[in-house]
């Protein structure tokens, strides 16, 4: 199950004690800051969590899976996320405990 912005707001309300309006503003502002930084071409480093950055992908050949026809995939910029070591360790510990 995915964690939604609405669930984040609810958790801030329950665990931090912000009222729902403040919690929603906090979550919206956080994501606005991330978006603004990426739009400016900046890398985002969240200590203990991971890094977001823009990566330029060159044009490359692709193939239509139905017809087999070669089609070019145009150059584009994508957002990438690389998880930090602490996040990897916590996820590994959680996944390991479920197996």
Swiss-Prot record:
Name of a matching Pfam family: Bac_DNA_binding
Entry's Gene Ontology molecular function annotations: DNA binding; structural constituent of chromatin
GO biological process, one term: DNA recombination
The keyword Transcription regulation is assigned to this record: yes
Coiled coil start-end: none
Keyword entries, A-Z: DNA recombination, DNA-binding, Transcription, Transcription regulation, Translation regulation
Matching InterPro entries: Hist_DNA-bd (IPR000119), Histone-like_DNA-bd_CS (IPR020816), IHF-like_DNA-bd_dom_sf (IPR010992), IHF_alpha (IPR005684)
Single GO cellular component term: cytosol
Keyword Protease included in the entry's annotation: no
Family per record: Belongs to the bacterial histone-like protein family.
NCBIfam families, per the entry: himA, PRK00285.1
Function: This protein is one of the two subunits of integration host factor, a specific DNA-binding protein that functions in genetic recombination as well as in transcriptional and translational control.
Oligomeric form and interacting partners: Heterodimer of an alpha and a beta chain.
HAMAP family: IHF_alpha (MF_00380)
Record's protein name: Integration host factor subunit alpha
Organism field: Xylella fastidiosa (strain 9a5c)
């Amino acid at each position: 199950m995915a964690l939604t912005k609405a669930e984040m707001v609810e958790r801030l309300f329950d665990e931090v004690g912000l009222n729902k309006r403040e919690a929603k503003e906090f979550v919206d502002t956080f994501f606005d800051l991330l978006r603004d930084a990426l739009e400016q071409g900046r890398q985002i480093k969240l200590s203990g969590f991971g890094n977001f950055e823009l990566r330029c992908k060159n044009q490359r050949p692709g193939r239509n899976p139905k017809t087999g026809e070669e089609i070019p995939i145009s150059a584009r910029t994508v957002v990438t996320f690389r998880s930090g070591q602490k996040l990897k360790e916590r996820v590994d510990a959680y996944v390991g405990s479920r197996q």
